[in-house]
C-alpha cells in the first residue's frame, strides 16, 4: 500500500497558521498548567475517551477535546502508536553515532529523517554530530540499511553502529508528572486486556495488524473507522485488532510533547559501562529514574545507552550523580547533548521541537525501497 509522506516543506505554511491560532495557550514559550495536565492524562491512557480525560483534568469533554486539538494543530503535542518493547526486542534495533563533514550535518539529518527505518534523528554536541535510532525486521535488513543506505549518504565521514540486545525502557513510560494523584487514578482505564495473557508472537502479526500499527504511528488517536480503512477490514475487526495489539503489548501508545514547551530543555544521551555480571541489575536501576526516556543494553562497548530529558545543561552532572547513587557500579563513559531533534519516533519536528509531519514506521518493508 503506497503512502504520500508528509514533509516539513509541504505543510510548513499550514502549521505556521495553526501555531499562530494556538499561540494564546503558550505563555513565554511554555505550556499552561491546564495544557500540561491534559498531556499528562493522555500519557497514562492515550486513547481514553474525552469523558474520562475530562474527569481527570476537571473540565468538560468538549473543552478537553478542543484544548487537545489546539495542542496538536500547533505541533505542541501528539499521540503516536509504536511497536511495543517485546516487538522491538524481537526485531533488530540499533543506535548509530554519525560524524559528518563540516556544514553537512543538517543535510544528512534531513535525508535520514525521511527514511521509515530511521525512527529518531538527533543533531548532537559531543563525540558525534548525529545520534540515530534505526530498526528493521531482522539483522539482514538492518545490515542492508546501514551499509547500502546510511554509509553512502554524502557528507557522512564516520559511523558507529551498536545493536540493541534488549530494551528496558522507552518513551511511552516517561511521565510529565503534571496530573494530581486523583486525576491519575481516573485515567487508569482498563485496556480491554483479555489478550494480555497471550502475547503476540512477532511472526503472527498479520499484514492488517501492521497497517493498523502504521496508522497508529501517524495518529495514535485515529478513529476506528480510519484504522479499518487503512487495514481494509471492518470497523468491528479493527476494534478487535487494536484491543489485541494493545492488550498484548505488541503496540504501545505514547503521548509526546514538544520538550522545551514542557520545561525539558536539554535531552542527553549517555553511554554507560557496567560489569557484565551486573548488567541487568544496572539497567533496571537506571530505567526506574524519572528523567530516563530510554534505557537499552547493547552488543558493543560500552554496553548501555541511556536517553534522558533534563531542565538545563547544568543538571547533567547532577543527573550523573543521581545515576551513580542509584546504581553505584556504573560508569558514564560518554555524553551527547541533543542540539535539535529532527525526528522523534516517526514524527518530524521543526527547530523548536514542534511536530510538523510524520513518516510511517513501516520497518517491515525493504529498507532500500522508496515508499
Regions found by a protein language model. Give the residues of each.
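A compositional/biophysical signature of low hydrophobicity enriched in polar/charged and small residues
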Residues: 3-371
Amino acid at each position: 500500500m503506497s503512502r504520500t509522506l508528509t514533509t516539513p516543506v509541504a505543510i510548513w505554511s499550514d502549521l505556521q497558521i495553526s501555531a499562530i491560532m494556538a499561540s494564546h495557550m503558550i505563555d513565554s514559550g511554555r505550556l499552561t498548567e491546564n495544557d500540561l495536565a491534559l498531556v499528562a492524562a493522555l500519557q497514562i491512557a492515550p486513547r481514553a475517551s474525552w469523558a474520562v480525560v475530562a474527569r481527570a483534568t476537571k473540565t468538560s469533554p468538549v473543552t478537553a477535546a478542543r484544548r487537545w486539538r489546539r495542542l496538536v494543530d500547533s505541533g505542541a503535542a501528539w499521540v503516536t502508536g509504536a511497536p511495543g518493547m517485546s516487538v522491538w526486542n524481537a526485531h533488530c534495533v540499533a543506535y548509530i553515532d554519525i560524524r559528518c563533514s563540516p556544514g553537512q550535518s543538517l543535510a544528512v539529518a534531513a535525508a535520514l529523517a525521511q527514511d521509515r527505518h530511521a525512527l529518531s534523528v538527533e543533531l548532537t554536541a559531543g563525540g558525534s554530530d548525529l545520534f540515530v535510532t534505526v530498526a528493521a525486521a531482522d539483522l539482514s535488513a538492518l545490515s542492508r540499511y546501514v551499509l547500502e543506505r546510511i554509509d553512502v549518504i554524502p557528507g557522512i565521514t564516520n559511523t558507529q553502529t551498536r545493536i540493541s540486545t534488549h530494551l528496558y525502557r522507552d518513551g511511552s513510560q516517561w511521565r510529565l508528572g503534571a496530573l494530581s494523584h486523583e486525576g491519575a487514578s481516573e485515567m487508569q482505564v482498563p485496556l480491554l486486556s483479555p489478550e494480555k495473557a497471550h502475547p503476540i508472537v512477532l511472526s503472527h502479526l498479520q499484514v492488517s495488524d501492521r497497517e493498523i500499527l502504521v496508522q497508529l504511528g501517524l495518529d495514535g488517536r485515529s478513529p476506528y473507522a480510519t484504522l479499518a480503512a487503512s487495514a481494509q477490514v471492518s470497523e468491528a475487526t479493527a476494534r478487535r485488532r487494536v484491543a489485541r495489539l494493545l492488550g498484548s503489548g505488541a503496540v504501545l501508545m505514547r503521548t509526546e510533547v514538544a520538550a522545551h514547551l514542557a520545561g525539558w530543555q536539554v535531552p542527553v544521551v549517555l553511554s554507560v559501562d557496567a560489569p557484565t555480571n551486573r548488567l541487568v541489575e544496572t539497567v533496571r536501576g537506571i530505567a526506574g529514574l524519572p528523567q530516563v526516556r530510554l534505557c537499552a543494553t547493547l552488543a558493543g562497548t560500552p554496553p548501555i545507552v541511556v536517553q534522558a530529558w533534563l531542565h538545563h545543561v547544568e543538571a547533567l552532572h547532577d543527573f550523573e550523580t543521581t545515576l551513580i547513587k542509584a546504581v553505584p557500579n556504573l560508569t558514564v563513559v560518554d555524553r551527547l547533548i541533543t542540539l535539535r531533534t529532527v525526528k522523534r519516533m516517526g514524527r518530524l519536528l521543526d527547530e523548536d521541537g514542534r511536530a510538523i509531519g510524520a513518516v510511517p514506521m513501516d520497518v517491515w518493508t525493504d529498507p532500500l525501497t522508496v515508499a
